[in-house]
Amino acid sequence: VISTLTASGINVIDIGITPTPTALYIVEKLKLHGGIMVSASHNPIEWNALKLIGKGGKFLDEKSVIELNKLYDKKSSRFVKALETGTYQKIDDAIEQHIKRIVRFIDIDKIKKRNFKVACDYVNGTGLFATPKLLKALGVKEISINKEWTGKFSHIAEPSANSMKSLSDLVKKNKVDIGFTQDPDADRLAIVLNDGTIVSEEYTLALCAKYLWSVGKGDAAVNLSTSRMIDDLAKEKGYSVDRTKIGEINVSSHVVKNRLYFGGEGNGGIIVPAVSPGRDSLLGIALILELMAKENKTIKEIIEEIPKYEIVKEKLEVAKIDENSFLKNIKLKY
């Protein structure tokens, strides 16, 4: 990827192996024209591909993807002459820069005073390069599993109730304050309560929203599949929650365009444009820890204060279908 870009006359900054939110942050901070992540997120290795980042550290929107496909179909790219190749620069502290930005956004001293002890399941993903550094900066003691860079996920990588049994056991065995698990590219976050109870990843956004509305003001945006917990929390504070089409770019673009306070998705993603342009599990960890410190309560006590809704998330394999006809019929029926 790097060689092709430089051979095309494009200057490249290599930030190494980092979480996706770190890459988004660096693209925004350095005012780059774009970025490329090689990732399959929580999917199996055969799904590895190029995740394209646009200006401002946001993923490409629908219009940009259409334009990109047209350029690809033209097959008009070319390599430049030898003396016109792009430059190559390596940055080794991208994660540290990202963490510094998060730390500036929160009350680090309040967290440090609590001497938290947490359990983490990194699923052998990129979170293992960043989260320990964040926790150390926050004065938090960490006990972890699946913290090896093997290139293979230790279990189902998507953060959900079905993949968190090992983390739950770790929490109960070590009597920690909370358990955290991230997906392999660390843009999504799920938690286990201090008694080992596994809760839906929908609570991640609700907890972050509860904290953010306790220290700041403003409306929010979430996608259509997100739990109504956040609507109830917003109503308590007198704020509104806009709903967007599913897709991180739809949420983040709506937040920026309408100058909203924050946004997110019920799959464990929190977006705070003042810190980072996309879903950020590292920020989510910091916000939840500060919420616990600020309210001086256990995570279980805080969860019990949030309105409860049930949601079942299942994936079904289906035969090849005509997507347009299928969606048209769904719209007609509902």
Question: What is each PLM-predicted segment?
Answer:
Residues 1-47, 133-192:
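N-terminal small/polar loop signature for handling phosphorylated ligands or for N-terminal nucleophile
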Residues 6, 15, 66-100, 193-266, ...:
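Proline/glycine-rich low-complexity loops and linkers
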Residues 178, 216-334:
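Phosphate-binding and adjacent anionic-ligand microenvironments
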Residues 182-184, 198-203, 276-280:
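Short glycine/threonine-rich catalytic loop with a Thr-x-Gly-x-Asp
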Residues 1-3, 46-55, 130-132, 187-205, ...:
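Short Gly/Thr/Asp-enriched flexible loops that form oxyanion-binding sites at enzyme active sites
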Residues 48-174:
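Gly/Ser/Thr-enriched, mixed-charge loops and adjacent short helices
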